[in-house]
Amino acid sequence: MGRFFSMDNKFFTFMNKVADLCILNIICLVCCIPIVTAGASITAMYYVTLKMVRNEEAYIVRSFFKSFKDNFKQATIINLIMIAVGAVLYLDLNVAKNMPGSAGQIFHVIFMAFVIIYYVLFLYVYPILARFYNTIRNTIKNALFMAIRHLPYTVVMVLIGLCPLLLLFICSYQIQSTLFVLFLVMGFGVIAYCNSFFLVKIFDLYMPKEENEEQKSEGTEV
């Protein structure tokens, strides 16, 4: 009985992880409400989940706001760039949709390809910012480089990120609503945590062996 209630019990370890992801998810969502701070919030979330995967996490809230503060400037600039590019892509898709004939279809395919690139960049750029010191230009360039070089991992992370869309195919409104609420409570944190298993494997390839585990690596261009 004592062993069952031990904090080292796998069940309690799992539940602690779930609780941490719920807390992390809610903090991230709250800090994303002023859209301009979303970049810093997502970066901070990945800072924590990357540590969780390495079993280095201590205080979720403290670690989150440490990264939020340290990376705020760069993350905000990158976020504004991503918002601007996303807005342009949205307008381009609408223009292509309203174009008559085959020209509209061709442009629609072209712009959808750019949307995929945009989404892949989104998957990598904030985790890279959370893990490496670098310039904004090199952070974006390295995000594209890693996404292409580690394409199998990229495909898996894309599929993980698209999993919430499965909610649209659930016929029962009650089940759909329940899962949607559950996703709002911990969904983004779970996605970041799952992606972090792959990101840790990727990032380890670019980390100096002698680097202290508590610090980011100095931003060598990969």
Where are these regions (language model features)?
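Helix-coil boundary and N-terminal low-complexity module in membrane systems
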Residues: 1-111, 118-222
